[in-house]
Regions:
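N-terminal active-site segment of His-dependent metallophosphoesterases
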Residues: 1-53, 66-69, 86-94, 100-102, ...
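Active-site neighborhood of phospho(di)ester-bond hydrolases with catalytic His/Asp-centered motifs
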Residues: 5-8, 31-38, 65-66, 73-82, ...
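Binuclear metal-dependent phosphoesterase catalytic core
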Residues: 11-21, 152-209
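Short, well-ordered secondary-structure micro-motifs
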Residues: 16, 44-46, 126, 145-146, ...
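Short, solvent-exposed coil/turn segments at beta-strand boundaries
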Residues: 28, 86-88, 108-111, 148, ...
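Acidic, Ser/Thr-rich peripheral helices and adjacent loops at domain boundaries
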Residues: 52-60
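Active-site-proximal segments of metal-dependent phosphoesterases and phosphodiesterases across multiple
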Residues: 79-129
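Conserved beta-sheet core of the metallophosphoesterase superfamily
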Residues: 116-178
Length: 209
């Protein structure tokens, strides 16, 4: 799995859209989560979808759009319609945290990641099962390992050395975190979690341990 992480927009919808396009097109994330709680991504996606289909972008209106666009269209125009609809569907890969206090749990095989806007709201129940703790509220991009846990934040979307992060599961089951700068370059990348292969049981003095 490849999970994109997009930092808060800081009232900059233009840059937010550019970073969302980067996550979808360049990083090819399976899904992406916006870590702000200002509703900015909802607004960006709404306008983006409307721009693509030049009308009501809802699923329920797809047949109406098809009738209007394709009834007397050329093959080239039909291909353009289908391309726009595919892109509209792709926008569903962009998600938001449900609300300011919400936690979202993501599973990479046996690795648990908890996503939240403000890490100050993390409690013991959040931290115990999690190997990766992702948060949005941060002035700087962060990859910081403490023991077996990693704290990760992409930082604001306008940050020159961050704004976007990617959690990617590798072939060996390790999870790698990468930070991407505003120019699309990799700023930092490291393995932040390894799969739990299960505890080994040994017997010493007749007692299992």
């Amino acid at each position: 799995m490849r999970l994109g992480l997009i930092g808060p927009a800081k009232r900059n919808p233009k840059v937010l859209r550019e970073r969302a396009e980067f996550v979808l097109d360049e990083l090819r994330a399976d899904r992406a989560v916006y870590l702000g709680v200002d509703g900015a991504l909802d607004d960006v996606v709404k306008h983006w979808a409307h721009e693509l289909v030049k009308g009501d972008p809802s699923d329920s209106a797809v047949w109406q759009r098809a009738a209007q666009s394709c009834a007397n269209a050329s093959a080239q125009q039909i291909n353009a319609f289908l391309s726009a609809e595919r892109r509209r569907q792709q926008l569903k890969q962009l998600e938001c945290l449900p609300h300011a206090n919400a936690r979202t749990i993501e599973l990479f095989e046996s690795v648990v990641a908890v996503l939240i806007h403000d890490k100050a709201l993390l409690d013991e129940e959040d931290m115990l099962p999690a190997s990766i703790l992702v948060f949005g509220r941060s002035a700087e991009p962060v990859i910081h390992k403490i023991g077996l846990r990693c704290f990760l934040s992409p930082g604001p979307v306008t940050h020159p050395s961050g704004g976007v992060a990617l959690l990617a599961e590798e072939e060996d089951g390790n999870v790698r975190a990468s930070l991407y700068g505003i120019d699309g370059s990799v700023v930092k990348s490291e393995v932040v979690a390894q799969p739990n292969r299960g505890a080994r049981m040994t017997v010493q003095g007749g007692a299992a341990s």
